[in-house]
Regions:
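Non-catalytic alpha-helical scaffolds
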Residues: 1-130, 138-156, 251, 262-421
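Active-site micro-motifs of SAM-dependent methyltransferase domains
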Residues: 62, 135, 211
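MIDAS-like acidic motif and immediate structural context at the N-terminus
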Residues: 132-134, 166
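A short acidic, glycine/proline-enriched capping/turn motif at secondary-structure boundaries
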Residues: 135-137, 170
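Conserved GTP-binding G-domain of TRAFAC-class P-loop NTPases and closely related GTPase folds
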Residues: 157-319
Protein backbone atom coordinates (compact mmCIF):
# COMPACT_ATOMS: atom_id res chain seq x y z
CA UNK A 1 0.00 0.00 0.00
CA UNK A 2 2.77 2.42 0.92
CA UNK A 3 4.56 1.57 -2.33
CA UNK A 4 1.43 2.37 -4.34
CA UNK A 5 1.03 5.67 -2.46
CA UNK A 6 4.65 6.67 -3.14
CA UNK A 7 4.24 5.73 -6.79
CA UNK A 8 1.08 7.83 -7.00
CA UNK A 9 2.82 10.83 -5.42
CA UNK A 10 5.77 10.53 -7.83
CA UNK A 11 3.38 10.33 -10.76
CA UNK A 12 1.55 13.47 -9.64
CA UNK A 13 4.84 15.32 -9.09
CA UNK A 14 6.03 14.25 -12.54
CA UNK A 15 2.85 15.57 -14.12
CA UNK A 16 3.21 18.87 -12.29
CA UNK A 17 6.84 19.23 -13.41
CA UNK A 18 5.84 18.45 -16.99
CA UNK A 19 3.00 20.98 -17.00
CA UNK A 20 5.17 23.67 -15.42
CA UNK A 21 7.94 22.94 -17.92
CA UNK A 22 5.54 23.33 -20.82
CA UNK A 23 4.27 26.61 -19.43
CA UNK A 24 7.80 27.94 -18.98
CA UNK A 25 8.69 27.01 -22.55
CA UNK A 26 5.45 28.57 -23.78
CA UNK A 27 6.20 31.76 -21.89
CA UNK A 28 9.70 31.85 -23.37
CA UNK A 29 8.38 31.41 -26.90
CA UNK A 30 5.78 34.12 -26.32
CA UNK A 31 8.32 36.52 -24.85
CA UNK A 32 8.73 39.49 -27.19
CA UNK A 33 11.96 39.64 -29.15
CA UNK A 34 14.57 42.15 -28.06
CA UNK A 35 14.50 45.13 -30.41
CA UNK A 36 17.45 46.05 -32.59
CA UNK A 37 18.78 49.59 -32.23
CA UNK A 38 17.75 51.03 -35.59
CA UNK A 39 19.68 53.97 -37.02
CA UNK A 40 18.22 56.08 -39.81
CA UNK A 41 20.18 56.89 -42.96
CA UNK A 42 19.36 60.14 -44.73
CA UNK A 43 19.04 60.16 -48.53
CA UNK A 44 18.18 63.13 -50.73
CA UNK A 45 17.01 62.54 -54.32
CA UNK A 46 17.59 65.40 -56.75
CA UNK A 47 16.72 65.80 -60.40
CA UNK A 48 15.35 68.30 -62.87
CA UNK A 49 11.69 68.26 -63.89
CA UNK A 50 10.93 65.31 -66.15
CA UNK A 51 14.04 63.35 -65.18
CA UNK A 52 12.01 60.37 -63.94
CA UNK A 53 12.29 60.71 -60.15
CA UNK A 54 8.60 60.06 -59.50
CA UNK A 55 8.47 56.87 -61.58
CA UNK A 56 11.74 55.77 -59.96
CA UNK A 57 10.23 56.16 -56.49
CA UNK A 58 7.26 53.91 -57.32
CA UNK A 59 9.51 51.33 -58.94
CA UNK A 60 11.93 51.42 -56.02
CA UNK A 61 9.26 50.53 -53.48
CA UNK A 62 8.03 47.77 -55.80
CA UNK A 63 11.50 46.25 -56.11
CA UNK A 64 12.01 46.19 -52.34
CA UNK A 65 8.68 44.48 -51.68
CA UNK A 66 8.49 41.23 -49.71
CA UNK A 67 9.17 38.28 -51.99
CA UNK A 68 10.07 34.62 -51.53
CA UNK A 69 13.73 33.80 -51.04
CA UNK A 70 14.81 37.26 -49.89
CA UNK A 71 15.16 37.70 -46.12
CA UNK A 72 14.19 41.38 -46.03
CA UNK A 73 11.82 43.94 -47.52
CA UNK A 74 11.00 47.64 -47.24
CA UNK A 75 7.87 48.83 -45.46
CA UNK A 76 6.35 52.20 -44.69
CA UNK A 77 3.26 53.66 -43.06
CA UNK A 78 -0.16 52.60 -44.42
CA UNK A 79 -0.97 55.93 -46.07
CA UNK A 80 2.34 56.05 -47.93
CA UNK A 81 1.99 52.38 -48.88
CA UNK A 82 -1.40 53.06 -50.46
CA UNK A 83 -0.15 56.19 -52.22
CA UNK A 84 2.89 54.41 -53.69
CA UNK A 85 0.66 51.52 -54.77
CA UNK A 86 -1.61 53.95 -56.58
CA UNK A 87 1.40 55.63 -58.16
CA UNK A 88 2.74 52.28 -59.35
CA UNK A 89 -0.67 51.40 -60.79
CA UNK A 90 -0.58 54.53 -62.96
CA UNK A 91 2.93 53.66 -64.09
CA UNK A 92 2.23 50.07 -65.18
CA UNK A 93 -1.22 50.66 -66.74
CA UNK A 94 -0.66 51.32 -70.47
CA UNK A 95 -3.99 53.16 -70.65
CA UNK A 96 -2.94 55.66 -67.97
CA UNK A 97 -0.70 58.67 -68.63
CA UNK A 98 2.65 58.88 -66.88
CA UNK A 99 2.41 60.30 -63.34
CA UNK A 100 2.98 64.02 -63.09
CA UNK A 101 6.28 65.18 -61.63
CA UNK A 102 6.78 66.27 -58.06
CA UNK A 103 5.62 69.86 -57.63
CA UNK A 104 7.38 72.23 -55.31
CA UNK A 105 4.59 71.84 -52.77
CA UNK A 106 4.79 68.05 -53.18
CA UNK A 107 8.34 67.72 -51.89
CA UNK A 108 8.18 65.22 -49.06
CA UNK A 109 10.13 62.76 -46.93
CA UNK A 110 9.40 59.03 -47.14
CA UNK A 111 10.41 56.75 -44.29
CA UNK A 112 11.22 53.20 -45.35
CA UNK A 113 11.90 50.52 -42.75
CA UNK A 114 14.20 47.73 -43.87
CA UNK A 115 12.47 44.77 -42.25
CA UNK A 116 14.36 41.52 -41.74
CA UNK A 117 12.39 38.29 -41.75
CA UNK A 118 13.32 35.85 -39.00
CA UNK A 119 11.46 32.89 -37.56
CA UNK A 120 9.85 34.55 -34.54
CA UNK A 121 8.75 37.85 -36.03
CA UNK A 122 9.87 40.53 -38.50
CA UNK A 123 12.12 43.22 -37.03
CA UNK A 124 13.41 46.53 -38.40
CA UNK A 125 17.13 46.47 -39.19
CA UNK A 126 17.46 50.15 -40.09
CA UNK A 127 15.49 53.00 -41.65
CA UNK A 128 15.95 55.01 -44.83
CA UNK A 129 14.72 58.62 -44.79
CA UNK A 130 14.22 59.39 -48.49
CA UNK A 131 13.64 63.04 -49.40
CA UNK A 132 12.21 63.54 -52.90
CA UNK A 133 12.70 67.14 -54.02
CA UNK A 134 10.72 68.81 -56.78
CA UNK A 135 12.77 69.42 -59.91
CA UNK A 136 11.43 72.95 -60.30
CA UNK A 137 13.26 74.01 -57.16
CA UNK A 138 16.49 74.22 -59.18
CA UNK A 139 15.02 77.15 -61.06
CA UNK A 140 15.16 79.09 -57.79
CA UNK A 141 18.89 78.64 -57.17
CA UNK A 142 20.45 82.04 -56.67
CA UNK A 143 17.23 83.48 -55.31
CA UNK A 144 16.39 84.03 -51.67
CA UNK A 145 13.87 81.41 -50.65
CA UNK A 146 13.07 79.48 -47.47
CA UNK A 147 12.64 76.23 -49.41
CA UNK A 148 16.15 76.62 -50.81
CA UNK A 149 17.59 77.17 -47.35
CA UNK A 150 15.96 73.93 -46.23
CA UNK A 151 17.27 72.12 -49.31
CA UNK A 152 20.85 73.26 -48.70
CA UNK A 153 20.61 72.14 -45.08
CA UNK A 154 19.30 68.70 -46.04
CA UNK A 155 21.95 68.23 -48.71
CA UNK A 156 24.76 69.11 -46.32
CA UNK A 157 23.39 66.67 -43.71
CA UNK A 158 22.69 63.78 -46.10
CA UNK A 159 24.40 60.39 -45.92
CA UNK A 160 23.94 60.00 -49.68
CA UNK A 161 22.73 62.04 -52.64
CA UNK A 162 20.96 60.49 -55.61
CA UNK A 163 21.19 62.68 -58.70
CA UNK A 164 18.74 61.58 -61.40
CA UNK A 165 19.83 62.28 -64.98
CA UNK A 166 17.25 62.14 -67.76
CA UNK A 167 18.50 59.39 -70.08
CA UNK A 168 16.65 60.85 -73.05
CA UNK A 169 18.45 64.19 -72.63
CA UNK A 170 21.77 62.43 -72.04
CA UNK A 171 21.27 60.62 -75.36
CA UNK A 172 20.68 63.97 -77.07
CA UNK A 173 23.92 65.21 -75.52
CA UNK A 174 25.80 62.17 -76.84
CA UNK A 175 24.36 62.85 -80.30
CA UNK A 176 25.59 66.44 -80.16
CA UNK A 177 22.09 67.92 -80.22
CA UNK A 178 21.53 71.42 -78.86
CA UNK A 179 18.83 70.36 -76.39
CA UNK A 180 21.13 67.73 -74.94
CA UNK A 181 24.01 70.18 -74.54
CA UNK A 182 21.73 72.71 -72.86
CA UNK A 183 20.47 70.04 -70.46
CA UNK A 184 23.88 68.69 -69.45
CA UNK A 185 25.84 71.93 -69.38
CA UNK A 186 23.14 74.17 -67.89
CA UNK A 187 20.46 72.21 -66.05
CA UNK A 188 22.58 69.36 -64.71
CA UNK A 189 25.31 71.82 -63.79
CA UNK A 190 22.90 73.54 -61.42
CA UNK A 191 22.19 70.24 -59.66
CA UNK A 192 25.90 69.41 -59.53
CA UNK A 193 26.59 72.84 -58.06
CA UNK A 194 24.25 71.95 -55.22
CA UNK A 195 25.77 68.49 -54.76
CA UNK A 196 29.22 70.02 -54.47
CA UNK A 197 28.23 71.48 -51.11
CA UNK A 198 27.89 68.00 -49.59
CA UNK A 199 30.68 65.63 -48.60
CA UNK A 200 28.71 62.38 -48.73
CA UNK A 201 28.63 59.65 -51.38
CA UNK A 202 26.96 60.63 -54.65
CA UNK A 203 25.00 58.31 -56.93
CA UNK A 204 24.40 59.69 -60.41
CA UNK A 205 21.72 57.51 -61.96
CA UNK A 206 21.01 57.58 -65.67
CA UNK A 207 17.24 57.10 -65.69
CA UNK A 208 15.35 55.81 -68.73
CA UNK A 209 18.37 53.67 -69.60
CA UNK A 210 16.16 51.73 -72.02
CA UNK A 211 16.15 54.86 -74.21
CA UNK A 212 19.92 55.45 -74.18
CA UNK A 213 20.98 54.08 -77.56
CA UNK A 214 21.45 55.24 -81.13
CA UNK A 215 24.19 57.76 -80.29
CA UNK A 216 26.98 56.23 -82.37
CA UNK A 217 27.71 53.11 -80.34
CA UNK A 218 28.26 49.78 -82.14
CA UNK A 219 25.10 47.90 -83.01
CA UNK A 220 26.09 45.07 -80.67
CA UNK A 221 27.17 47.34 -77.79
CA UNK A 222 26.28 45.97 -74.37
CA UNK A 223 25.49 47.94 -71.21
CA UNK A 224 29.17 48.24 -70.28
CA UNK A 225 30.11 49.68 -73.68
CA UNK A 226 27.24 52.15 -73.59
CA UNK A 227 27.89 53.17 -69.97
CA UNK A 228 31.59 53.66 -70.68
CA UNK A 229 30.74 56.06 -73.51
CA UNK A 230 28.23 57.90 -71.32
CA UNK A 231 30.77 58.23 -68.49
CA UNK A 232 33.49 59.58 -70.78
CA UNK A 233 31.09 62.09 -72.29
CA UNK A 234 29.84 63.32 -68.92
CA UNK A 235 33.40 63.71 -67.64
CA UNK A 236 34.01 66.29 -70.39
CA UNK A 237 31.63 68.60 -68.53
CA UNK A 238 33.76 70.67 -66.16
CA UNK A 239 31.28 70.75 -63.27
CA UNK A 240 30.83 66.98 -63.30
CA UNK A 241 34.55 66.36 -63.65
CA UNK A 242 35.28 68.65 -60.71
CA UNK A 243 32.62 66.94 -58.60
CA UNK A 244 34.07 63.48 -59.26
CA UNK A 245 37.64 64.56 -58.54
CA UNK A 246 36.63 66.14 -55.22
CA UNK A 247 34.74 63.08 -53.91
CA UNK A 248 35.80 59.71 -52.57
CA UNK A 249 32.62 57.93 -53.68
CA UNK A 250 30.79 58.74 -56.90
CA UNK A 251 28.92 56.05 -58.82
CA UNK A 252 27.23 56.22 -62.22
CA UNK A 253 24.37 53.72 -62.31
CA UNK A 254 22.18 53.02 -65.35
CA UNK A 255 18.59 52.33 -64.34
CA UNK A 256 15.23 51.79 -65.94
CA UNK A 257 12.21 52.15 -63.69
CA UNK A 258 10.07 50.20 -66.17
CA UNK A 259 12.45 47.96 -68.13
CA UNK A 260 13.60 47.66 -71.72
CA UNK A 261 10.33 46.40 -73.22
CA UNK A 262 7.78 48.72 -71.64
CA UNK A 263 8.02 52.07 -73.45
CA UNK A 264 9.29 53.60 -76.68
CA UNK A 265 10.44 57.06 -77.68
CA UNK A 266 8.49 58.85 -80.39
CA UNK A 267 11.36 60.62 -82.16
CA UNK A 268 8.99 62.99 -83.97
CA UNK A 269 7.46 64.41 -80.79
CA UNK A 270 10.06 63.51 -78.17
CA UNK A 271 7.37 61.83 -76.09
CA UNK A 272 7.94 58.55 -74.26
CA UNK A 273 4.93 56.32 -74.87
CA UNK A 274 3.90 53.11 -73.12
CA UNK A 275 3.60 49.99 -75.23
CA UNK A 276 0.13 48.40 -75.14
CA UNK A 277 1.76 45.00 -74.63
CA UNK A 278 4.78 46.25 -72.68
CA UNK A 279 6.45 44.17 -69.98
CA UNK A 280 7.15 45.91 -66.66
CA UNK A 281 10.62 44.73 -65.55
CA UNK A 282 12.61 47.41 -63.64
CA UNK A 283 16.38 47.36 -64.04
CA UNK A 284 18.92 48.34 -61.36
CA UNK A 285 16.53 50.67 -59.49
CA UNK A 286 17.43 49.21 -56.08
CA UNK A 287 21.20 49.59 -56.52
CA UNK A 288 21.57 53.24 -55.43
CA UNK A 289 19.84 52.38 -52.13
CA UNK A 290 21.67 49.06 -51.69
CA UNK A 291 25.04 50.80 -52.04
CA UNK A 292 24.46 53.49 -49.42
CA UNK A 293 25.22 51.66 -46.16
CA UNK A 294 28.12 49.50 -47.47
CA UNK A 295 29.74 52.56 -49.08
CA UNK A 296 29.26 54.67 -45.95
CA UNK A 297 30.68 52.05 -43.61
CA UNK A 298 33.56 51.29 -46.00
CA UNK A 299 34.56 54.97 -46.00
CA UNK A 300 34.57 55.00 -42.20
CA UNK A 301 36.52 51.72 -42.05
CA UNK A 302 39.16 52.95 -44.52
CA UNK A 303 39.92 55.96 -42.33
CA UNK A 304 40.58 53.78 -39.25
CA UNK A 305 43.91 52.36 -38.11
CA UNK A 306 44.26 48.58 -38.23
CA UNK A 307 44.96 48.46 -34.47
CA UNK A 308 41.56 50.03 -33.79
CA UNK A 309 39.85 47.49 -36.03
CA UNK A 310 41.59 44.60 -34.26
CA UNK A 311 40.45 45.90 -30.88
CA UNK A 312 36.85 46.04 -32.10
CA UNK A 313 37.09 42.55 -33.57
CA UNK A 314 38.56 41.14 -30.35
CA UNK A 315 35.67 42.57 -28.35
CA UNK A 316 33.03 41.23 -30.74
CA UNK A 317 32.17 37.98 -28.96
CA UNK A 318 31.83 39.70 -25.59
CA UNK A 319 29.47 42.27 -27.11
CA UNK A 320 27.29 39.59 -28.67
CA UNK A 321 26.39 38.33 -25.20
CA UNK A 322 24.77 41.63 -24.30
CA UNK A 323 21.23 42.66 -25.12
CA UNK A 324 20.62 45.45 -27.65
CA UNK A 325 19.66 47.85 -24.86
CA UNK A 326 22.87 47.05 -22.98
CA UNK A 327 24.96 47.60 -26.09
CA UNK A 328 23.46 51.00 -26.79
CA UNK A 329 23.82 52.13 -23.18
CA UNK A 330 27.48 51.03 -23.06
CA UNK A 331 28.50 52.82 -26.25
CA UNK A 332 29.06 56.08 -24.38
CA UNK A 333 31.77 54.57 -22.18
CA UNK A 334 33.30 52.74 -25.16
CA UNK A 335 33.65 56.01 -27.09
CA UNK A 336 35.77 57.38 -24.23
CA UNK A 337 38.29 54.56 -24.64
CA UNK A 338 41.15 54.87 -27.18
CA UNK A 339 39.52 52.56 -29.75
CA UNK A 340 36.17 54.28 -29.27
CA UNK A 341 37.66 57.75 -29.63
CA UNK A 342 39.37 56.66 -32.86
CA UNK A 343 36.10 55.26 -34.20
CA UNK A 344 34.24 58.44 -33.29
CA UNK A 345 36.85 60.55 -35.09
CA UNK A 346 36.46 58.39 -38.20
CA UNK A 347 32.67 58.65 -38.13
CA UNK A 348 32.82 62.41 -37.57
CA UNK A 349 35.13 62.71 -40.57
CA UNK A 350 32.57 61.04 -42.85
CA UNK A 351 29.20 61.98 -41.36
CA UNK A 352 28.39 65.64 -41.18
CA UNK A 353 25.33 65.42 -38.97
CA UNK A 354 24.47 64.36 -35.43
CA UNK A 355 24.18 60.60 -34.95
CA UNK A 356 23.11 58.32 -32.12
CA UNK A 357 24.58 55.32 -30.39
CA UNK A 358 22.40 53.10 -32.59
CA UNK A 359 24.56 53.89 -35.61
CA UNK A 360 27.77 53.27 -33.64
CA UNK A 361 26.50 49.84 -32.54
CA UNK A 362 25.63 48.92 -36.14
CA UNK A 363 29.04 50.13 -37.30
CA UNK A 364 30.82 48.06 -34.64
CA UNK A 365 28.92 44.98 -35.71
CA UNK A 366 29.71 45.60 -39.38
CA UNK A 367 33.43 46.04 -38.71
CA UNK A 368 33.64 42.79 -36.75
CA UNK A 369 31.60 40.83 -39.33
CA UNK A 370 31.95 37.32 -37.87
CA UNK A 371 32.13 34.18 -39.95
CA UNK A 372 28.65 33.41 -38.61
CA UNK A 373 29.08 29.75 -37.81
CA UNK A 374 25.59 29.81 -36.41
CA UNK A 375 25.44 26.46 -34.68
CA UNK A 376 28.73 27.03 -32.85
CA UNK A 377 27.81 30.58 -31.90
CA UNK A 378 24.30 29.74 -30.72
CA UNK A 379 25.52 26.81 -28.63
CA UNK A 380 27.87 29.13 -26.75
CA UNK A 381 25.06 31.31 -25.44
CA UNK A 382 23.77 30.41 -22.02
CA UNK A 383 20.43 32.22 -22.08
CA UNK A 384 17.47 32.39 -24.41
CA UNK A 385 17.77 36.18 -24.63
CA UNK A 386 21.38 35.88 -25.82
CA UNK A 387 20.43 33.42 -28.54
CA UNK A 388 17.51 35.54 -29.71
CA UNK A 389 19.65 38.68 -29.69
CA UNK A 390 22.27 36.94 -31.83
CA UNK A 391 19.58 35.96 -34.32
CA UNK A 392 18.61 39.62 -34.64
CA UNK A 393 22.21 40.72 -35.26
CA UNK A 394 22.66 37.92 -37.76
CA UNK A 395 19.47 38.87 -39.62
CA UNK A 396 20.73 42.42 -40.10
CA UNK A 397 24.15 41.15 -41.19
CA UNK A 398 22.42 39.10 -43.89
CA UNK A 399 20.81 42.28 -45.26
CA UNK A 400 24.12 44.15 -45.40
CA UNK A 401 25.86 41.17 -46.98
CA UNK A 402 23.20 41.05 -49.69
CA UNK A 403 23.60 44.79 -50.32
CA UNK A 404 27.37 44.35 -50.57
CA UNK A 405 26.99 41.49 -53.06
CA UNK A 406 24.75 43.65 -55.24
CA UNK A 407 27.41 46.36 -55.28
CA UNK A 408 30.13 43.85 -56.17
CA UNK A 409 28.02 42.46 -59.02
CA UNK A 410 27.48 45.99 -60.33
CA UNK A 411 31.20 46.74 -60.31
CA UNK A 412 32.07 43.45 -62.01
CA UNK A 413 29.44 43.83 -64.72
CA UNK A 414 29.85 47.59 -65.21
CA UNK A 415 33.34 48.82 -64.24
CA UNK A 416 32.47 52.22 -65.72
CA UNK A 417 29.92 52.67 -62.92
CA UNK A 418 32.76 53.57 -60.53
CA UNK A 419 33.67 57.20 -61.23
CA UNK A 420 35.49 57.77 -57.96
CA UNK A 421 36.35 55.64 -54.95
Amino acid sequence: MEFVLVLLILTVVGLIVRVVGRQVRRNRSNRPLPELPTPAFKVVALGNSGSGKTVLLASLFYQFRAKPGRPYYFDTDPATRVWLGSLLSRVVDPAEPWPTGTTRSGTRTYTFDCVTQIREAPTTAFTIEYVDYAGEIFELLGESDTALDELFERVRGADALIGVLDGRRVTQFLRGEAQGRAYVIAKIAVMVQLMAQARCAIYLVVAKWDLVHGFGEPADADDQERLDRVARALMTVDQINDLVRARTTVRLIPISAVGSAFATLDESTGQVRKRPDGTFAPYNVELPIAAIVPDLFARIRESMHDDTVRTIEDDYHARQRRTPDELVSEVGSFLLQPAGAALRASIDGVLHRPYGNELVVMMLDWIARPSRQKEVELAAFRTDVQRRTFQLWDARAVVLDDFQKQVHRLELALPASVLSR
